[in-house]
Amino acid sequence: METIKIMGENLTTGAKKVLKEFHSFKDAATYGRSIKKYLKETNKGYEETLGFASICYAVGPNGHKYQYYYCF
């Protein structure tokens, strides 16, 4: 297990699944790109390190919410 910093937030590898909620698609996409960029810059294979990563769109009672799922 290892802790990496993405957009000022510490993430621990080895986590089963993490769900992060955003208020805009742009924020969710930027977050995803930041993770990929970090893995590329540190020579960690994206496919090898992340089990999956996808952006999900859901509409709830409070309006639109964008969620980013990633798995180490």
Question: Which role fits each region the language model picked out?
Answer:
Residues 3, 25-29, 68-72:
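A broadly tuned "polar low-complexity/structure-edge" signature
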Residues 12, 21, 56-60:
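Alpha-helical interaction segments
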Residues 17-20, 66-68:
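Short beta-strand segments
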